[in-house]
Amino acid sequence: MGGPKLLMPLRPRPWTCRTCLQRLHSARRSLKTAASPSPQSTSFEYNRSAHNTQKSTTDDETLRRVFDSPSFWKEFSQRSSLHTKPTGLVQNQYLTSPEGFRTFANVSLHKCQAIVHKVLAASTLEEYRDMARDLDRLSDLLCRVIDLSDFIRVIHPDPQVQEAATQAYALMFDYMNVLNTTTGLNDQLKKAAANPDVTSHWSAEEKIVAQILIKDFSNSAIHMPPNERQRFVNLSNEISQLGSNFVNAAEPAKSHVVVGTNSLRGLDPLLVQQIKRWNRTASVPTMGMIPRLVLRSVHDEGVRKDVYLATRTSSSRQIKRLEQLLAKRAELAQLSGYASFGHMTLSDKMAKSPEAVSNFLTSLVGSNRQFVHEELAQLQGMKGSSPLQAWDHAYYVHQRVMQYSQSRRSRELSIVPEFFSLGTVMQGLSRLFNRLYGVRLVPQETAPGETWNPDVRRLDVVDEAERHIAVIYCDLFSRPNKHPNPAHFTLRCSREISNQEVAECASMDQSAHPNDGMATAVDPQSKTLRQLPTIALVCDFPDPPATSAGRPSLLSEHSVRTLFHEMGHALHSILGQTRLQSISGTRCATDFAELPSVLMERFATAPEVLSMYARHWQTDQPLSENMMRSMEQDRTAHGSIYGAVENEAQILMALVDQAYHSVPAEAAGKIDSTAIYHQVSQAHSSLPEPSDTQPPTSWQGFFGHLYGYGATYYSYIFDRAIANKLWEDVFQSGQASVDRNAGERYKNEVLRWGGGRNGWDCVAGVLGSGNPSNADGRLVEGGDDAMREVGRWGLGRDGVSG
């Protein structure tokens, strides 16, 4: 792979929570933010001839039944096959067969080439004024193929379709790399952006997109002399290979720890038999689940210590890979004119610099420290007089959790999933969206060929005037060979379609559609055609049992929070509809991208929200207030056992990430990643790694996200701190969680801008100038002080992985 991509930088998902981190989101991208354009309306004319117009109450009941009743879903989904002509995947007119992917890619490629020719030949003032929109459309055409093909090749069960989608993806990806080396595009865009007679006619969105594209060109080394550009490409390829090896070849220095079987008391006897050897010893592996169970269960502290040290000591080969990766990144940054890789990566994020991130993280350590000490004091009391050690934590936490799980309240909570059928939770999401933002979810029959699996449900998002504003495909049930991790995919961004594009399609082919047949609507204000955001939600919930007399798929509280999290991303895409696709929805700064999803988790279990939807699947009885209180007490209890220590662990990982990526190029060749890791641990950990072992522990070799999220690992906890503040001050810790005024305030200041507004402007706007944390609007400026202020907001006690 080459360096960072200009028009559609294919990067890993900007940031994700603990469960998100392993999900496949390669088509998402991190974008930059600048000045603030005026937000666009997200209400469009609803095509009543093509969509269900039943009353919202009927839609609400249908929504529950399409997910909870297999027989109802079968009847509902088969209606369309009787009177609807076949269509392509997600309504794309080309994707009716595997061969259609090639046609789709070639048609899109032809359109791209025409735009490139127009941009390179531009000479008149009018042509330069069109340039930002033209290049945004070029990006959209690339994304149309790459995003959708990348998703289909992962999710579709048919190998022929997978292969066809992979070929379409490769064709457009290769062409994108050609564009990244087309210097004329960069030269023409810079010429347009430097001309006041051009920029005075650009909207604020066009100015932002132009600056984003110029920055992406710069990140692709297009401005460098040929020899330096080639070095940039070579370094990027080396980094890609080293990073892939680092992630995939993680290995401990020792593969096993040999202990006496008698010293494994506390471990499940079946597991002991599994690892037992012939001479009364057992071979404990140092990777996988077994060593975790040993640390959690074995009474012998000496065994726990040996296993702990072995599981946190990487092989010398793995450490060498990491240090080579860090050195190459530092060299790449120096070649690009930056002091370090961290400075290069953070220049277009909310944080702006490694120093600001460190301010945030050290401030966060302080706000979290008291809670950590309280948790460790409880564990120390359980251990007794000898000091609590790092290898003791999992053991005593497990004991406390087991003690709590035997309590009456904990046993009572075993019936909570009975109130969280999947259909009921989807009802709750729709009701919440309607209450806060005036939009709801409407089940829609699919045409033959529209979905990749018969279990996929389509939901149309409509506003209070019954206008269609988005499409969501819900692939939520488990099936063989399906990727198990929950995920949100934007298959197509929102964008304004010009009259010129409509005319172009009409001239090409009578059957051609300006959005390839996918969902469109007319903006009632501007009367322009728009492509609607098309989203896929993928989860792995169990199918409703076939032999349980109508029992639906029931979700744990954790699964409910996960679904709300992913719907938070979807909500950003639904409401963040801009005229240009490069800044629509989730295409915002990396360290702002998780805010809507993290905040959305807080709504899942707020009593005010639970009362709107949590009902027993069989009796329809609402979840009682006593049960809601028990759920809250349960979360508080678990948080008080391990939440703050988990928070500290995440903070330390982010500090290590910053330390590694702040090393300048001249020092990168001598980097000692293990020494840096221990320096951070000793300085900031309340339960630091032992410093006197030989060899010293080197857990950083297992920290695979150093590659995918280099210099940005702080982003999730940063957004979590902001989300906690918004929950407390805007939604009043849940008391305003169904209040329309609070919802409108959040929508207007945060969601509807997509990536078209600086994240600090969004935070300052939603908090208001009267908030003590934003006195006189000081958060707007961002910088070190603002980052430190966010650190003071803290993370609460739920634990990052809660």
Curated annotation (Swiss-Prot):
GO molecular function: metal ion binding; metalloendopeptidase activity
Ranges of compositional bias, category Polar residues: 33-56
Active site: 566
Reaction(s) catalysed (UniProt annotation): Release of an N-terminal octapeptide as second stage of processing of some proteins imported into the mitochondrion
Source superkingdom: Eukaryota
Transit peptide, from-to: 1-24
Binding site for Zn(2+): 565, 569, 572
Cofactor(s) the protein needs: Zn(2+)
Biological-process GO terms, alphabetical: peptide metabolic process; protein processing involved in protein targeting to mitochondrion
Enzyme Commission (EC) number: 3.4.24.59
Xref: SUPFAM superfamilies: Metalloproteases ('zincins'), catalytic domain (SSF55486)
Magnesium keyword on record: no
Cofactor: record remark: Binds 1 zinc ion.
UniProt keyword S-adenosyl-L-methionine, yes or no: no
Gene3D superfamilies in UniProt: Collagenase (Catalytic Domain), Neurolysin, domain 3
GO cellular component: mitochondrial matrix
Cellular location(s): Mitochondrion matrix
UniProt main location, coarse: mitochondrion
UniProt keyword list: Hydrolase, Metal-binding, Metalloprotease, Mitochondrion, Protease, Transit peptide, Zinc
Region (Disordered): 28-61
CDD domains: M3A_MIP
Role according to the record: Cleaves proteins, imported into the mitochondrion, to their mature size. While most mitochondrial precursor proteins are processed to the mature form in one step by mitochondrial processing peptidase (MPP), the sequential cleavage by MIP of an octapeptide after initial processing by MPP is a required step for a subgroup of nuclear-encoded precursor proteins destined for the matrix or the inner membrane.
Family, as annotated: Belongs to the peptidase M3 family.
Protein name: Mitochondrial intermediate peptidase
Organism this protein belongs to: Aspergillus terreus (strain NIH 2624 / FGSC A1156)
Top-level taxonomy: Eukaryota, Fungi, Dikarya, Ascomycota, Pezizomycotina
